[in-house]
Amino acid sequence: MSTAKAPTLPASIFRAYDIRGVVGDTLTAETAYWIGRAIGSESLARGEPCVAVGRDGRLSGPELVKQLIQGLVDCGCQVSDVGMVPTPVLYYAANVLEGKSGVMLTGSHNPPDYNGFKIVVAGETLANEQIQALRERIEKNDLASGVGSVEQVDILPRYFKQIRDDIAMAKPMKVVVDCGNGVAGVIAPQLIEALGCSVIPLYCEVDGNFPNHHPDPGKPENLKDLIAKVKAENADLGLAFDGDGDRVGVVTNTGTIIYPDRLLMLFAKDVVSRNPGADIIFDVKCTRRLIALISGYGGRPVMWKTGHSLIKKKMKETGALLAGEMSGHVFFKERWFGFDDGIYSAARLLEILSQDQRDSEHVFSAFPSDISTPEINITVTEDSKFAIIEALQRDAQWGEGNITTLDGVRVDYPKGWGLVRASNTTPVLVLRFEADTEEELERIKTVFRNQLKAVDSSLPVPF
């Protein structure tokens, strides 16, 4: 039993949706121990002594996870160690094992020297002030002490079987699977093959150095190899997973990148066809076309804040059956558990495409599309980013448009929209624009440019 007092941990690692830092600098083995103590204490306070723990394929994983588990055990928690698995497999463990708490040690798509913690306590994904509360527990030494236990649990076969039994493929497909040397490589290619597809694996060996490309399918440059392979192999589809497998990137048979909001169009159509009136949630970065489409299918569109933890909370509150974020997190509550799961989402996509006579390019090109910018980032400071947004919400003049201020400022005009919001994870302002003509796109950009300059004339506006 440890009665030692914790060192002061850097405040910077306690972020909006998770805890994340640079290994050996802001995040050490000792830090992992005390974070384990805080999470264990919080879980026990909520009446949950059982905690599942997993880790991704990062090089720092084994050392950090050992200390994380020790911290949980020293609280008196019963730990189920599920080993090296994708994040959704850890979430799955926290749904189907005895306990409803779980900690995933993962750096997601950050560079190799990062690691972090995604945390579920008693069925709730922690965010914002709940993550700050863990830091306060450590500072106040408000920590449980006890003698817990650790059990190794092989959860992968159970997860594998549940998805395999859930998905019905109408015909086999040829799929290129790029795991970017992330932890999805331990299951995604094998599972997709078990569904009846022929799989061409790309970078599916787990390697925490990420020697081939960064495991972030949200950036087009990381999909170059996948696109080339899909074309060379004449494949039906390309799938790319991020470093911890909770996001998926999609490429059609002709090499077109399908952005997550367009993926959500297909998923919404499918889910609402069986569940008329279902709520479908999407974040403020998604296309305006989703709103009319979801309504047209007979569903109820719900726009919400960006952030996987925040979306999960909103799903619980609304009873939504499906949610998606522009970052690539997709959450199925229909036939699944409601957590973000890149691997399950990929399987659902294959099921839908297998039932369609058209190729994937034609399936997606049938949906309406606008001209859009990629995500534009303006570097500011941690302190100024929220102040700028507050000033824009308070003072800016946007003209004739529908203004949404639930996360930054989004203005929907008759023929397009613009968004400016503060990133919750980095000191940047995030912007995105979309319109049905180039002229309208430029007009909306000009409005936003002028309003930003009015708030702070020194701001760089790279658009």
Swiss-Prot record:
Residue positions binding Mg(2+): S108, D242, D244, D246
Task: State how changing S108C affects the protein, per the record.
Answer: KM for G1P unchanged, kcat decreases 24-fold; G1,6P stimulates reaction by 2-3 orders of magnitude. No stable protein phosphorylation detected, altered ligation of metal residue
Key word Ligase present = no
Task: Identify the stretch(es) annotated as Topological domain 1.
Answer: 13-142
Q: Which cofactor does it need?
A: Mg(2+)
UniProt cross-references to PROSITE patterns, sorted A to Z:
PGM_PMM
Q: What happens when the gene is disrupted?
A: No longer expresses O-antigen LPS side chain or A-band LPS, sensitive to serum, resistant to virus E79. Has no phosphomannomutase nor phosphoglucomutase activities. Does not make rhamnolipid.
Q: Return the annotated region ranges for Topological domain 4.
A: 375-453
* Region named Topological domain 3: 260-364
State the residue spans of region: Topological domain 2: 159-255
The active site lies at: R20 (proton donor), S108 (non-phosphorylated intermediate), H329 (proton acceptor)
Mutating H329A leads to what result?
No phosphoglucomutase activity using G1P as substrate, protein is less easily phosphorylated, no significant change in structure
Q: How is the cofactor bound?
A: Binds 1 Mg(2+) ion per subunit. Zn(2+) can substitute, but yields a catalytically inactive enzyme.
Q: Which residues bind alpha-D-mannose 1-phosphate?
A: Y17, H308, E325, M326, S327, G328, H329, R421, A422, S423, N424, T425
Q: Name one Pfam family in it.
A: PGM_PMM_I
GO BP terms: namely: alginic acid biosynthetic process; GDP-mannose biosynthetic process; lipopolysaccharide core region biosynthetic process; O antigen biosynthetic process
* Function according to Swiss-Prot or TrEMBL: Highly reversible phosphoryltransferase. The phosphomannomutase activity produces a precursor for alginate polymerization, the alginate layer causes a mucoid phenotype and provides a protective barrier against host immune defenses and antibiotics. Also involved in core lipopolysaccaride (LPS) biosynthesis due to its phosphoglucomutase activity. Essential for rhamnolipid production, an exoproduct correlated with pathogenicity. Required for biofilm production.
What quaternary arrangement does the UniProt entry report? Answer: Monomer.
Protein name per Swiss-Prot or TrEMBL: Phosphomannomutase/phosphoglucomutase
Which organism encodes this protein? Pseudomonas aeruginosa (strain ATCC 15692 / DSM 22644 / CIP 104116 / JCM 14847 / LMG 12228 / 1C / PRS 101 / PAO1)
Name of the encoding gene: algC
